[in-house]
C-alpha cells in the first residue's frame, strides 16, 4: 500500500497546543448534558490558550433533523462558546462535517485491514454488533486474497475491527483513572457500514487524530467503548488523546435527564424565562467544583479557574430551584436598561396599553423576579382592574378595615385630584401628609390606596409606584370604584 497520502495527512495535523472538539450530531435541540460537554470542552481549550473545534457528526443519516445544525450554531453563539475552527469558519484540517470526509474513512479502514487490525465481513447479518460473536464469524479468518476476491466481485460487506482474542486492554481516563477490560468481552464492532459510511465509533477516532485533538470530552456512557478506541489508536500507531468522561446529568437520583420525559433542553429553559448567562453558569457547576463557596462566575472567570481535577465521578442532579436562584442573582446584577429589554416581551404579554411604560414596570420587577415567565401574572391589574373582594382592605399589620379604608379613600381622592405634577415625590408627599394629618402610620393610608389601584394584595411595587405608572386619571377612576365597592359592602 502506498503510504504517501497518509503521510501527507499526518503532516497537516497541528502540533504543540491543546486542541479540543465539540462534535454534536444534528438530531434536535441541545439538551443540558450536551451543553455541559460543549462548555467543558471550550473551557479546557480556553484555560490552556488552545483551540476549540466544532465538528458536525452526521453519519447517522436516519436521525438527522432539518435545521438542527442551525440550532447548534445559534446555541453556541448565545452561550459564548466561540470556536476557532469549524464548518462555518474553516480551518487547517477540514472539512469539519463527517459526511464531507467520507473518502477518508474508507482509506483508513483499508489501512487498518492492511495492518491486520480489521477485516471485511461479507456475512448476511445485521450490522449492529450487539451479541456478535467474533469467534463464530468465518470472515475474520479469511485470507487477504479471499477477502480481496469477494470485494472485487462486488459482494457487499462491512468492515469490522479485529479485537485480539486474548489479553486485556487498559485505558486511562482523567476522571476515572486506569480501567482494564478483558479483550474477550469486546466484540468486533462495525467500522464501515455497507453503504460506505463510517460508524460513529470509527469516524470520531479518525477525525480526532487527523484534527490533532488532545483532549476528548464526552459522557461516561462511552467508557465501555474506550478500550476499542484505544485498540484503534494502537492499531494505527497513533498517540492516544486524554479522555475526560463526564458522569451523566440526572433528573433525580435514579433517572437521567431525557427530552422524552419532558426534561428541558437549553432552548426550553430560555423559553421558560431563564437567562443564558445563568444557565451556562449553573451548567458549569453540574458535576464540577471550583473549590470554595463562590458560585457566580463569568465565562472569562470560569476559563481562568477551570480544572479537570474538579470534575466529579458522581452523577449531577439537575435542580430547577437552584437554577432559579442563579437566575435571580443574574437578574439582580443586570443594568436596569438590560433588564428592561429582556423583560419587555413578558411585560407586554400582560400590559398591552402603549401608554403604560414597560421600562417603568421593569424597574419595579427587577429585584422581585426569579424567572422572566413569572412576570405576566404579576401584572394582570395594569390593563384592567380585576374583580376583587373588599375583604382585601382588611389588613391587621396596617391596621385597616373596610370602614377605615372607605374613609381614607374619600379623604385622599381630592388630595390626589389637586396634584398637578403626577410623580413619585408628589404622590408620596400627598399620602404621608394625610398620615400626619390623621395621626396614623403611612401604611394606613397606602394600603387602601394600593388595593383600590391594583385590586390585589401582592403587587410589584407599592402604592406610590403603581399610582404613578397607572397615571392620575386611571388612579382616580379606580379609587372611585373602590369607594363604590366599599359603600355597597358596608350598606
Predicted feature residues:
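Non-catalytic terminal extensions that flank enzyme cores
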Residues: 1-29, 49-52, 166, 244, ...
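Charged substrate- and nucleic-acid-binding regions of tRNA-handling and nucleotidyl-transfer enzymes
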Residues: 425-486, 490
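Residue-level signal for inorganic ion chemistry
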Residues: 41, 72, 112, 116, ...
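Glycine-rich phosphate/pyrophosphate-binding loops
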Residues: 46-60, 202-215, 236-250, 459-465, ...
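N-terminal Rossmann-like or analogous alpha/beta NTP/dinucleotide-binding catalytic cores
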Residues: 1-133, 226-238
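Active-site cores that bind ATP or allylic diphosphates and position pyrophosphate for catalysis
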Residues: 111, 119-245, 251-257, 265, ...
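Glycine- and acidic
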Residues: 20-27, 53-58, 211-216, 264, ...
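Small-residue-rich helix-loop
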Residues: 336-438
